[in-house]
């Protein structure tokens, strides 16, 4: 098999699609791909060491994102994090409603990444949820008046991206959160912050959001690693059942090397 390599005579500028692996991430990951490969969910000495390594990576990710370690759910990337936020976040809110109650509405920006937009549309069809897609203005910023209208009544979840993946518009998440608090204070705000790192101080920019998605390969980390921050006061119901990893929110054997690489890249990028 011939490896895909970047032509040395060309300049790679497509960093919004993916980034080269940072040397810091590669160096941190290599020992875990050869010697430190144990399953951190096990009970023997090697597993315990792997668990310490995983916990250290989670602690660093949490610190850099302005979260507590227990709020960081490790995922396979931004798409899974967004899917868990949309489906899991909405389901957690809906579960608090009476069985006979009408399901709470779902709100998102019409310019969301497909990982959010298609998740919202799929949820709307599967659960009979009213989906309200909010337009943006000529500059790509969310129309706050239209958002205020969309957030009236019983809304379960609102998803507005932090930075647009096509044109780079930075959304006013503080104003979005304020608008949401006036119209439907019981709703959860999710933001897809995949394109925000390393260009913004993500901890500050997303402080108003209850759910925050990131993806390692957008800031020099490995592909196949991401995270969803579930801040205190917000909840998600799992999309993947199994061994109960990630505090029951995302089952599956943890990708220790991926988490370590993501933590190293995030530290280098911020």
What name fits each language-model region?
Residues 1-270:
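Pyridoxal 5′-phosphate
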């Amino acid at each position: 098999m011939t490896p895909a390599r970047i032509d040395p005579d060309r300049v790679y500028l497509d960093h919004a699609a993916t980034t080269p692996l940072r040397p810091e991430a590669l160096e941190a990951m290599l020992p875990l791909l050869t010697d430190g490969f144990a399953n951190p969910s096990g009970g023997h000495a090697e597993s315990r060491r792997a668990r310490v390594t995983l916990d250290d990576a989670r602690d660093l990710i949490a610190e850099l994102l302005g979260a507590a370690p227990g709020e960081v759910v490790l995922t396979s990337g931004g798409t899974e994090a967004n899917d868990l936020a949309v489906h899991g976040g909405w389901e957690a809110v809906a579960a608090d409603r009476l069985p006979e109650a009408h399901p709470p509405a779902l709100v998102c920006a019409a310019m969301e990444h497909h990982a959010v937009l298609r998740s919202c549309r799929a949820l709307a069809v599967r659960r009979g949820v009213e989906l309200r897609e909010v337009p943006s203005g000529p500059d790509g910023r969310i129309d706050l008046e239209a958002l205020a209208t969309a957030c009236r009544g019983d809304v379960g979840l609102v998803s507005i991206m932090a930075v647009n993946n096509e044109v780079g518009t930075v959304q006013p998440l503080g104003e979005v959160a304020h608008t949401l608090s006036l119209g439907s204070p019981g709703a959860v705000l999710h933001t897809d912050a995949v394109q925000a790192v390393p260009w913004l101080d993500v901890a500050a920019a997303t402080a108003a959001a209850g759910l925050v998605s990131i993806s390692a390969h957008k800031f020099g980390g490995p592909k196949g690693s991401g995270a969803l921050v579930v801040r205190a006061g917000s909840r998600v119901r799992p999309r993947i059942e199994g061994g109960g990893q990630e505090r029951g929110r995302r089952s599956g054997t943890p990708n220790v090397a991926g988490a370590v690489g993501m933590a190293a890249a995030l530290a280098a990028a911020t």
